[in-house]
């Protein structure tokens, strides 16, 4: 069985880890970094870039560079948060055929699961390169507060990337696993996870290898991206005040501002002031305009104060649901890059009444925890039991549009609950059941997971048929439904077909696209490699011709020069096989030159060789050099 990897699929950055023996290890990507930007871009010629290469070109290609895609995953186009996001990103958010939020570039639509799959593919390749073997299985993390649609969409992303997702695990729970793996002490911990796009808080009890989640809460649209946006808003307002120009309509300028805002935010975690300089940010009739201003930590904190405060209410709710007070928390673990901000640490300390634990790397701890869970599933990690919870209540719509809960939030998963339903009219042969997830009292205010019809009910007066519907939530937090007609004992397994989401056919098509793209990427990489090889050979051959050209015949030299010219012409095109053939021709033509170089180097390094060859005493191809032993004392005298 191959290795199971752990992947933290983040809003801003992603990370991959694997168990090596009893220890988890974060794997560096091809660029040598331990985290990879969750950014996917398409260039003018259709090439797909993932990670750092995509981030580097974002400023010049804002409409085809997709970032923070996790905020759209599993959301409908009409979701108010999708509409809010439309005003925050330079790329186009479009309505998918299934009503979900998709993104668009050059007239082609992509689902958020598909874009996320490209990042997961990069993580998969990173692991394969390190392990030297194919990887087909993974544990992927999601925010604890993700609903069923978001979890299902994440699982779909894994499938599109060619991964069997063995488990979807909550990010704070993964962090707790990583934190508690080597610690023998038991206690109650709070994991405060403020990442690039989402916020979660989980209360866990740890002891004797058991990690039991007591409660979880959060906000799936609160994170570092919002902090960056506040700085961008401030910069555009200041620039408009000073220059009278509105930069919010300029996508190129906005992308530069976003990069500068992120950089300034990071610097202000260690410095009390930073300078933002963006020359040639725009121009008007009077000429080019430059943006230059100082941003203090105090000003930055005032810009984002309400965002930091927004994290406290979920903490309060999580404590209440867990039935503990802040003073009963033994340790507060900080997760997510945004927790490096001093103000965040200050607010957390004030709320929990204790200094937060900073012994874990907030960018890597979630991937490490995912690798630990992968190790548990693979049997490499023993004596670890993880008991997670469902973050949201699950129920159905009943008479009058009321939300009737079947499974309450913070119920330990996997879990199962049955309820008997009946008909509302005489001889009714079908019932529509609408399944919702959320905490509001009216069904319409919660998230519709999907609906299904129970058909073929035998004719009977209303209220007589007994249909037992069983809801169960698996260890991934994903909902399944089974229905059984108690009269006939006939049972139906019903897969909730979400109102949006990807169908099996959609996923299959995207898997094929991903495979085709992987093949195209492989060919593109191969082309780059053969071109590099060809150019290196031309350079080396030309250098050799200038040094040893007089040692070969004019005909041989002419053959080499024409082979160089032919390879140069081939390098201007994109035919990898043609370039390989011309490279081979040049290698063949250069053989005489190689022989001359070898003979010359042999001659230089062998005293007496020239005399031996000139005298004609040896007829062999190999020239024997004369030698004589020299007495050491004699040598010193001569010297």
Swiss-Prot record:
Keyword Cytoplasm listed: no
Spans annotated as Disordered: 599-639
Biased composition (Acidic residues): 623-632
Lineage top rank: taxon: Bacteria
Residues with Phosphothreonine modification: 198
Keywords: ATP-binding, Chaperone, Nucleotide-binding, Phosphoprotein, Stress response
One Pfam family cited in the UniProt record for this chain: HSP70
Any one GO MF annotation of this record: unfolded protein binding
InterPro entries (UniProt xref): ATPase_NBD, Chaperone_DnaK, Heat_shock_70_CS, HSP70_C_sf, HSP70_peptide-bd_sf, Hsp_70_fam
Low complexity bias (residue ranges): 599-615
Induction data: By stress conditions e.g. heat shock.
SUPFAM superfamilies associated with the record: Actin-like ATPase domain, Heat shock protein 70kD (HSP70), C-terminal subdomain, Heat shock protein 70kD (HSP70), peptide-binding domain
PANTHER family: HEAT SHOCK PROTEIN 70KDA
Stated role: Acts as a chaperone.
Family listed: Belongs to the heat shock protein 70 family.
NCBIfam families: PRK00290.1, PRK05183.1, prok_dnaK
Protein name: Chaperone protein DnaK
Gene transcribed to yield this protein: dnaK
């Amino acid at each position: 069985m191959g290795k199971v990897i752990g992947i933290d699929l983040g809003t801003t950055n992603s990370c991959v880890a694997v168990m090596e023996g009893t220890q988890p290890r974060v794997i560096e990507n091809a660029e040598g970094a331990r985290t990879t930007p969750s950014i996917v871009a398409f260039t003018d010629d259709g090439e797909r870039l993932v990670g750092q290469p995509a981030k580097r070109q974002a400023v010049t290609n804002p409409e085809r560079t997709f970032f923070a895609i996790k905020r759209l995953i599993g959301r409908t186009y009409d979701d108010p948060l999708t509409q809010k996001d439309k005003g925050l990103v330079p790329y186009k958010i479009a309505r998918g055929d299934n009503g979900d939020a998709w993104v668009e570039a050059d007239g082609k639509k992509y689902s958020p699961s598909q874009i996320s799959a490209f990042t997961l593919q990069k993580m998969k390749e990173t692991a394969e390169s390190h392990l030297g073997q194919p990887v087909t299985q993974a544990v992927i993390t999601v925010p604890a507060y993700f609903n069923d649609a978001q979890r299902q969409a994440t699982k779909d992303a894994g499938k599109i990337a060619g991964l069997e997702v063995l488990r979807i695990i909550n990010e704070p729970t993964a962090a707790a696993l990583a934190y508690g793996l080597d610690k023998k002490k038991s206690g109650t911990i709070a994991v405060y996870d403020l990442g690039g796009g989402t916020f979660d808080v989980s209360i866990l009890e740890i002891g004797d290898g058991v990690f039991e989640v007591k409660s979880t809460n959060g906000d799936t649209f609160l994170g570092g991206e919002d902090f960056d946006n506040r700085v961008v808003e401030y910069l555009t307002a200041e620039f408009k005040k000073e220059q009278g120009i509105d930069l919010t309509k300029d996508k190129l300028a906005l992308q530069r501002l976003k990069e500068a805002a992120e950089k300034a935010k990071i610097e202000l975690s260690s410095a009390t002031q930073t300078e933002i300089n963006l020359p040639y940010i725009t121009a008007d009739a009077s000429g080019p305009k430059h943006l230059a201003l100082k941003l203090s930590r105090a000003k930055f904190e005032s810009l984002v104060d309400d965002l930091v405060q927004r994290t406290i209410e979920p903490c309060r709710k999580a404590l209440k649901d867990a039935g503990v007070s802040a003073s009963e928390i033994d340790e507060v673990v900080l997760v997510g890059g945004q927790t490096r901000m001093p103000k965040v640490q200050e607010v957390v300390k004030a709320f929990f009444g204790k200094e937060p634990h900073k012994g874990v790397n907030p960018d890597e701890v979630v991937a490490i925890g995912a690798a630990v869970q992968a190790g548990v599933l693979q049997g490499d990690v023993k004596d670890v039991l993880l008991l997670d919870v469902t973050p949201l209540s699950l129920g159905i719509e009943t008479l009058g549009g009321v939300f009737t809960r079947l499974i309450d939030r913070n119920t330990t998963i996997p879990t199962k609950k049955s309820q008997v339903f009946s008909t509302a009219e005489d001889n009714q042969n079908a019932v529509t059941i609408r399944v919702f997830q959320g905490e509001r009292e009216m069904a319409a205010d919660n998230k519709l997971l999907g609906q299904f019809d129970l058909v073929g009910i035998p004719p009977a007066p209303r209220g007589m048929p007994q249909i037992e519907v069983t809801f169960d939530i698996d260890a991934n937090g994903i909902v399944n439904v089974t229905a059984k007609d108690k009269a006939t004992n006939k049972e139906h397994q019903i897969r909730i077909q979400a109102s949006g989401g990807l169908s099996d056919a959609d996923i299959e098509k995207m898997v094929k696209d991903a495979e085709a793209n992987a093949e195209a990427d492989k060919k593109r990489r191969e082309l780059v490699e053969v071109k590099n090889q060809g150019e290196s050979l031309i350079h080396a051959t030309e250098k050799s011709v200038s040094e040893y050209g007089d040692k070969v015949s004019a005909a041989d030299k002419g053959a080499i020069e024409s082979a160089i010219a032919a390879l140069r012409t081939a390098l201007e095109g994109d035919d990898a096989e043609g370039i390989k053939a011309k490279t081979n021709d040049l290698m063949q033509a250069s053989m005489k030159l190689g022989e001359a170089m070898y003979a010359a180097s042999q001659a230089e390094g062998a005293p007496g060789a020239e005399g031996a060859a000139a005298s004609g005493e040896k007829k062999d191809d190999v020239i024997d050099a004369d030698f004589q032993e020299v007495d050491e004392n004699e040598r010193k005298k001569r010297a």
